[in-house]
Design a protein with these regions (language model features):
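Sec-dependent N-terminal signal peptides of Gram-positive bacterial secreted proteins and lipoproteins
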Residues: 2-24
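Surface-exposed, active-site-proximal loop segments in enzymatic domains
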Residues: 78-87, 108-122, 151-153, 221-227, ...
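Extracellular adhesion/carbohydrate-binding repeat motifs centered on closely spaced tryptophans
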Residues: 14, 24, 332-435
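Aromatic-lined substrate-binding rim segments of carbohydrate-active enzymes
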Residues: 57-111, 120-125, 129, 133, ...
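N-terminal carbohydrate-binding accessory modules
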Residues: 22-71
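Acidic/histidine-rich helix-loop elements
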Residues: 40-58, 76, 80, 115-118, ...
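Active-site region of glycoside hydrolase catalytic domains
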Residues: 124, 128-225, 231, 239-263, ...
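Aromatic-rich peripheral "rim/lid" segments of glycoside hydrolase catalytic domains that contact
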Residues: 268-335
Length: 435
């Protein structure tokens, strides 16, 4: 009897000292709980591109965790070989070790170009092999079945539903309670969520992935227009989110934004950091209000993977999205010192550098520094737009009555509004209110 009690006591002690998260990770996670855990993350090419595969190292996951990245969407386009699994295993382990949720997302290009039975079998086989390999992994790992339904497949909603039915059936053979994600056609557009048919074997562990502005906002394309953040431009974003909320209410299935981008990095890079911040803050705030998690596209725009460091100039954009770097903040945000000499004010950073010919965010306000590094005041013409800096150097927004007695309007990004109507007041080509 004493031996039995001793054995039970040892067993109790053994389990009591194990980390709680090791148990939690091996318990199936319901979709709504999973959505809350996802929080805010990044799309990554760690297992997709040659450069991404070669550059990846464990420090990356540590840095992501320190920045407050809660999940990563690991995009994959190739067949899974032993080497592919070896690298992906490492990435997933690194994520879990650093409290980052990993999501495997498959490109399935051939199937999107030609949704034939032959190509469907290839994708079903790919997911079957991948699901078998990860069947005993933490339930924090999830599967995003197809990245962006584009090309020919986007024209065939019924075929897409058949495809999801077959893939889900295959994955459920080995992963009955793992979170799976399906996305609507036409580049995961939430307008087509209602076209989705819920797969038979969803088993109550299903989410929908959708996105907008995945490749960028635009200053000319009306479908994803963002210039200065007009009411009309904001409404485009709100309407998309409401489509997702309506679908969630109708189906009881949570959604997640798998990709959105703060700037047009791949198409001219026409948005300044300051403009990106204004856009990023509005999008992230609206998604936060809706309790919809999101992933930002993509890591290489913010993180130097060759040198394992965040780009200092992009940290304000990350912060606008709600990411917070732990322990050591950017020199932009901490350990800065205002210095005044016989010419004017300038900003000394922790590394003794100082901003020149650029905007800098300090204590929640934007400042412009000239080519000598001195803080600007008054009207300044920057990148083909007029801005007004208050006497303390902070950027002005809203209505401004200038010394000439005329009224001007400064947009949310600080730029002067021209040739437009604001609140019923017409503004001319020089920005002044036309009386």
């Amino acid at each position: 009897m004493k031996k039995k009690i001793s054995a039970l006591l040892l067993l109790f002690l053994f389990f009591s000292i194990l980390p709680m998260k090791s148990f939690a990770a091996n318990v199936p996670i319901k979709p709504w709980d999973y959505a809350q855990k996802l929080g805010k993350g990044l799309d990554v090419d760690w297992s997709k591109t040659k450069e991404g595969k070669e550059a990846y190292n464990s420090q990356t996951a540590k840095d992501f965790s320190d920045m407050g990245i809660k999940h990563v969407r690991i995009r994959i386009k190739d067949d899974m070989t032993d080497e592919s699994f070896k690298l992906l295993d490492k990435q997933i382990k690194d994520c879990l070790d650093n409290n980052i949720i990993p999501i495997i997302a498959y490109q399935a290009d051939e199937l999107k170009n030609d949704p034939s039975d032959k190509n469907l079998k290839k994708v079903v086989k790919w997911w079957g092999k991948t699901a078998e390999h990860y069947k005993d992994y933490s339930y924090l790992l999830s599967f995003d079945l197809i990245i962006e339904v584009t090309d020919e497949l986007k024209k065939e909603p019924e075929r897409l539903n058949e495809i999801y039915e077959e893939i889900v059936t295959e994955v459920r053979k080995t992963n009955s309670k793992r979170i799976l994600m399906i996305s609507p056609r036409v580049r995961s557009n939430p307008e087509y969520l209602n076209d989705l048919k819920i797969p038979t074997n969803h088993n109550g562990y299903l989410m929908a992935e959708w996105h907008f502005y995945a490749s960028s906002p635009s200053k000319t394309n009306n479908e994803k227009l963002w210039t200065t953040g007009t009411d009309k431009e904001k409404q485009i974003i709100i309407d998309k989110i409401n489509l997702a909320l309506d679908w969630q209410k109708k189906t009881g299935i949570p959604t997640w934004v798998g990709a959105w981008m703060a700037g047009d990095y791949n198409d001219g890079n026409n948005y300044s950091v300051q403009e990106q911040i204004v856009f990023a803050k509005f999008v992230s705030d609206e998604l936060d209000k809706a309790n919809i998690p999101f992933a930002v596209n993509s890591d290489t725009k913010f993180y130097d993977r060759q040198n394992n460091r965040w780009y200092d100039e992009m940290i304000p954009v990350l912060k606008a999205m709600g990411f917070t770097k732990n322990n050591v903040d950017s020199v932009i945000d901490k350990k800065t010192e205002w210095v005044k000499d016989n010419i004017g004010w300038w900003l000394k950073r922790a590394d003794n550098s100082y901003p020149k010919l650029q905007w800098e965010l300090v204590d929640g306000n934007w400042y412009w520094f000239d080519n000598n590094g001195y803080m600007a005041t008054g009207w300044k013409y920057i990148n083909n737009k007029w801005y007004y800096l208050n006497n303390d150097g902070s950027m002005k927004t809203g209505w401004l009555k200038d010394t000439d007695g005329k009224w001007y309007y400064l947009n949310t990004d600080g730029s002067m509004a021209v040739n437009t109507n604001v609140g019923g007041y017409n503004l001319g080509s020089n920005g002044a209110w036309i009386v």
